[in-house]
């Protein structure tokens, strides 16, 4: 039976809408330009925020950035650091945020240029840090809760030779200092003699700690100078170490490639 030309033409014209309908239901919530601007979602949207992934195999040991997170020598936290510079609600084609934060805020990394001006001028920035040091087997240890990390404390930890990455969990975690917006000078950190003992007597090249500085407030610059003098030790600060057992893990830390910056936010995870 011959198909009337008009019927054939109408069938061809209807194919695009049929394809769009199939695509919307099978592959995408909507095809751009064919659905309302809300995307056509009917279910209530609730983002899932995790600390642990893979049934306890992956631990996120980085802190979330919020206006209330502590900032160096501030009683008010970092404050507003993120804003929506372009908004779809105001007619923009997409949402685009901008941010402004100190590079040594939250979970972050120090480069040698942080305390050595000659290294800063020479270009020893976070882009020059060795990712091989920032990724690999790491030991999470608990530090005695009542003191800063001195040479005596380092000796008492009995960290074996050959261990190159150590995360030091201190009283800072128990006190939840990284969850308090007011900067606290009584945090636990390395004294100069503890830093020197580590450099002289261990193979540690990655030093991680659970507040904004690896160095105790009373030995702030001297301890940093010891750690960063040889440009081989990398400092990761502001780690979130609650809820993780002491022991051996695979650590993975990735700073931003900020050319010219002596510090950078860093995302760190532990894999069991």
UniProtKB/Swiss-Prot annotation:
Disruption phenotype: No visible phenotype under normal growth conditions, but the double mutants cyclase1 and cyclase2 are embryonic lethal. GO terms for biological process: L-tryptophan catabolic process to kynurenine. SUPFAM superfamilies: Putative cyclase. It comes from the Eukaryota. Gene3D superfamilies: Putative cyclase. InterPro entries: KFase/CYL (IPR007325), KFase_sf (IPR037175). Disulfide bonds: none annotated. It is found in: Secreted, Extracellular space, Extracellular matrix. Pfam families: Cyclase (PF04199). One of its GO terms (cellular component) is plasma membrane. One of its GO terms (molecular function) is arylformamidase activity. Residues 1-24 form the signal peptide. Coiled coil: none annotated. Keywords: Extracellular matrix, Secreted, Signal. May function redundantly with CYCLASE1 for normal plant growth, development and viability. This is Cyclase-like protein 2. It comes from Arabidopsis thaliana (Mouse-ear cress).
């Amino acid at each position: 039976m011959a198909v009337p030309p008009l019927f054939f033409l109408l069938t061809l014209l209807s194919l695009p809408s049929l394809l769009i309908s199939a695509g919307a239901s099978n592959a995408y919530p909507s095809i751009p330009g064919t659905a309302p601007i809300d995307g056509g979602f009917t279910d209530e949207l609730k983002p899932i925020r995790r600390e642990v992934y893979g049934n306890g195999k992956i631990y996120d040991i980085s802190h979330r950035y919020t206006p209330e997170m502590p900032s160096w020598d501030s009683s008010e936290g970092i404050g507003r650091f993120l804003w929506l510079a372009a908004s779809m609600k105001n007619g923009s084609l997409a949402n685009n945020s901008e941010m402004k934060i100190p590079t040594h805020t939250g979970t972050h990394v120090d480069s040698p240029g942080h305390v050595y001006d000659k290294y800063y001028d020479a270009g020893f920035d976070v882009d020059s840090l060795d990712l091989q040091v920032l990724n690999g087997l790491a030991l999470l240890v608990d530090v005695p809760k009542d003191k800063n990390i001195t040479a005596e404390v380092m000796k008492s930890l009995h960290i074996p030779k050959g261990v190159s990455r150590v995360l030091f969990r201190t009283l800072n975690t128990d006190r939840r200092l990284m969850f308090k917006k007011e900067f606290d000078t009584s945090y636990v950190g390395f004294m100069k003699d503890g830093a020197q003992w580590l450099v002289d007597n261990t193979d540690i090249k990655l030093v991680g700690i659970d507040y904004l500085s690896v160095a105790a407030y009373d030995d702030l610059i001297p301890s940093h100078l010891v750690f960063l003098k040889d440009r081989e030790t990398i400092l990761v600060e502001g780690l979130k170490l609650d809820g993780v057992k002491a022991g051996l893990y695979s650590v993975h830390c990735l700073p931003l490639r900020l050319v010219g910056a002596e510090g950078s936010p860093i995302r760190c995870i532990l894999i069991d």
